[in-house]
């Protein structure tokens, strides 16, 4: 009997997850929504108990049991939210949850408003995904476009001394005068003499 089998007896069997990334994102986002709805309901209950306590002057909260959650999503609304959640890319799941929590902390919505807030965050994330995808597509098109280098540009005209085709008055005068003596630091450009 080998020692390896004894060492592996307490390890969990390694199995690959059969869930797709979209399913995992869906489950994570819907769990976040459910948890935040429970938390909003608890806060709403605490606020109503505090108001009741101020109005009556007596605290009977120790006597009452915690009621079950009273608000739940309708099946149609749940399916619509799940349909939107499936479209979210896994890399945007974390930022979507952070944005949702940030809005909940800022606004402190009622339980009924939490699902609409969640839907608005998901729409915002989908818009951001679409914008980044378009920017990435433009970047890819730009990088795949053939570029011309400076070495491929060829001059169409060479710089060389040439005789002008346009006759001027000063040209007749210049033709009869001998060319000036050049200085040794400058190259000499002369038109070829036609014999």
Swiss-Prot record:
Changing residue 32 to K: Reduced the affinity of RD3 for GUCY2D. Changing residue 93 to P: Reduced RD3 affinity for GUCY2D by 80-fold. The keyword Cytoplasm applies. Transmembrane segments: none annotated. One of its GO terms (cellular component) is photoreceptor inner segment. Pfam families: RD3. Plays a critical role in the regulation of enzymes involved in nucleotide cycle in photoreceptors. Inhibits the basal catalytic activity and the GCAP-stimulated activity of GUCY2D and GUCY2F, two retinal guanylyl cyclases involved in the production of cGMP in photoreceptors. Involved in the transport of GUCY2D and GUCY2F to their target sites in the photoreceptor outer segment. Up-regulates the activity of GUK1, a kinase that also plays an essential role for recycling GMP and indirectly, cGMP. Plays an important role for the survival of rods and cones in the retina. It is linked to Leber congenital amaurosis 12: A severe dystrophy of the retina, typically becoming evident in the first years of life. Visual function is usually poor and often accompanied by nystagmus, sluggish or near-absent pupillary responses, photophobia, high hyperopia and keratoconus. This is Protein RD3. It comes from Homo sapiens (Human). The gene is RD3.
């Amino acid at each position: 009997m080998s020692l390896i089998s004894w060492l592996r007896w307490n390890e969990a069997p390694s199995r690959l997850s059969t869930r797709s990334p979209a399913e995992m994102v869906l489950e994570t986002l819907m769990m976040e929504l459910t948890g935040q709805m429970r938390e909003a309901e608890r806060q709403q209950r605490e606020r109503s108990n505090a108001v009741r306590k101020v109005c009556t002057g007596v605290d009977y909260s120790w006597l009452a049991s915690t009621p079950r959650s009273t608000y739940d999503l309708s099946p149609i609304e749940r399916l619509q939210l799940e349909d939107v959640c499936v479209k979210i890319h896994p890399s945007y799941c974390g930022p979507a949850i952070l944005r949702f929590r940030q809005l909940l902390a800022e606004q402190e919505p009622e339980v009924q408003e939490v699902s609409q807030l969640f839907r608005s965050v998901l729409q915002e994330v989908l818009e951001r995904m679409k914008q980044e995808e378009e920017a990435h597509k433009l970047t890819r098109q730009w990088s795949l476009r053939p570029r011309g280098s400076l070495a491929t540009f060829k001059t169409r005209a060479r710089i060389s001394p040439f005789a002008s085709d346009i006759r001027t008055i000063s040209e007749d005068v210049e033709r009869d005068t001998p060319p000036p003596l050049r200085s040794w630091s400058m190259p000499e450009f002369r038109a070829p003499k036609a014999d």
